[in-house]
């Protein structure tokens, strides 16, 4: 368990506290000591297979560079491993450090939260090949259930049309690297 949590991005740094968590889904809600420069709206419609998505995060933390990184992909399947209905399969390239980061549609509305990628060692042993871009995000239904169960307020998308530059700028302000100190 963390004794201190800090979140930071290229513009701000805050202390944070866990206000809700779900170990089954590897989800946590953090209360920040200040107000972020931007928030993400939650997508109000059901995402669909082949929908374009953008994953934002800090792959390998600050070891590569300190800024947020973006990867493009699609929703490959509306189910996770073994037909898990709480996950989407996406093909955007992800690494350690993307977990917990936003998965948004082309207009920057949240459609999921990055969770995991297939374990390369296990898949290679089972099938003789390495998996390529078989990654999984917590879907909106699961995220909304988590928020509602924990009485966390949220805002559904107003379906604004945003260009990719605006989406990039918003994600840069709204995505944080989480640092846990013991």
Regions found by a protein language model. Name each.
Residues 1-65, 83-87, 149-159:
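Conserved active-site neighborhood of the chymotrypsin/trypsin-like protease fold
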């Amino acid at each position: 368990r963390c004794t201190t949590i800090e979140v930071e991005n290229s513009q701000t740094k805050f202390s944070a506290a866990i206000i809700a968590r779900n170990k089954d889904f590897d989800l946590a809600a953090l209360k920040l000591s200040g107000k972020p420069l931007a928030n993400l709206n939650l997508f109000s419609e059901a995402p669909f297979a082949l929908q374009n998505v953008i994953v934002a995060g800090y792959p390998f933390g600050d070891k590569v560079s300190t800024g947020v990184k973006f990867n493009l992909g699609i929703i490959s399947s509306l189910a996770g491993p073994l037909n898990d209905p709480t996950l989407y399969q996406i093909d955007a390239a992800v690494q350690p450090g993307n977990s917990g980061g936003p998965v948004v549609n082309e207009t920057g509305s949240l459609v999921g939260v990055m969770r995991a990628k297939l374990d390369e060692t296990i898949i290679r042993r089972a099938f003789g090949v390495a998996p390529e871009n078989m990654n999984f995000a917590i879907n909106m239904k699961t995220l909304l259930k988590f928020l509602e169960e924990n009485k966390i307020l949220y805002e559904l998308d107003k379906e604004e049309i945003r260009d990719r530059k605006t989406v990039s700028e918003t994600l840069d302000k709204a995505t944080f690297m989480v640092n846990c100190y013991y």
